[in-house]
Amino acid sequence: MKSQYKKEYFVKNLRKVIRGENLKREEAFNCLKFLLDHEFGIANDSCFGAFFAAIQTKTPTIEEITGLMDVVLNYDRKPLIVERKFSEPLCGIIGSGKDDVKTFNISSISSIVGAAAGGKIIKNGSRSEASVAGTTDVFEELGLDVEMKDKIKFEKALNTYGFGFCDVAPYFPKMLKEYMGKFFFVHPLSYILPIASGVKFDRVVFGLASNATEKTAELLLRLGYDNSLVVAGHDKNGKNFDEISNIGKLKYLK
């Protein structure tokens, strides 16, 4: 598809969304792919923001979000294939971020506790965008080599201690360039993007800073994660945070 046709295709679908119409999975895929390929030059950031804001305003559908995640997981992702020397399932402990309470990165500590208790844990993440501290920030402060790209050392840590940290940046190069650090509002990928990991896990504990647990659970099923726990915590004032709450209401879905 030539560049001019890509622009016309994108504008046509953006107008559909602005009118309140839903996109098909393939249409959502193509639009995000064009954005990640930087097809619109200096206007790319504006197009990206308009596209995400328009979809979020009308309420994103499962088809649309799945199409967007197809780009992230199947087009942009450069997977890290590791050799496991254990039979237990590999669990990802992840959070959506963008919560209202502004806690420190609790899920990072939870992942260490999970591994210490005998679980096999992958913790993926990035630097903070809206929270007090991102996963990468926390582990860097604890002395971990967050930029380690040595596959053998990663495998040794995972097989010896049952824990591996995976900063997302090296494994999603196009997302790193066109997306990271630019979106501070809830958008269509907020419901599911944290499953994007260099190392694919078998099970998921997903902390969500909204009440859309059913939507996230259905998206996890669509993307092949059929053994997952989605949790949405609240504080005593009803504010959302992406953790299991012991200070207010907790909504969860398995």
Predicted segments with their positions:
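Catalytic-loop motifs flanking and including active-site residues across diverse enzymes
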Residues: C47, I106-S110, A212
